[in-house]
């Protein structure tokens, strides 16, 4: 079965197995929703960005079609992930907030959102306000001396690109673990 906080667990295991030479890029729903300091119901406390706890090199959020293609193109050219600071729909940790390559807004720090519900609410309000692919800015949040830099969201797909995605041969199968429950009726 899948462990709790699977992205953190698997990312750390991959780092142990492959070392620092292999870039680890996390994405998906868990990474997207936990990219900023966030409230965790299991621990009943505010946790750091999943990027901090996972030890990954980069986080891709949202649908990520553009970001994944651009990252793959650059990796093919042997460009290190540490130099991929300008890709929309991605996030990374930096030692200096000046490493952000977009117009940006600074959020209350991890320490501040842990200590104050008001700061937590302010950070959440800003995150939502800036989550617009056309006018959204990068968001910066300090985490224990490092800076989480979340680049603006990716631009939406054009009609032809969206059609190509819709035409992919999806299996439309549910996870086998749902078999004893009779499957997933919606599929």
PLM feature spans:
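N-terminal [4Fe-4S]-dependent radical SAM core
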Residues: 121-187
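Glycine-rich beta-alpha loop elements in corrinoid/cobalamin-binding modules
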Residues: 1-143, 150-151
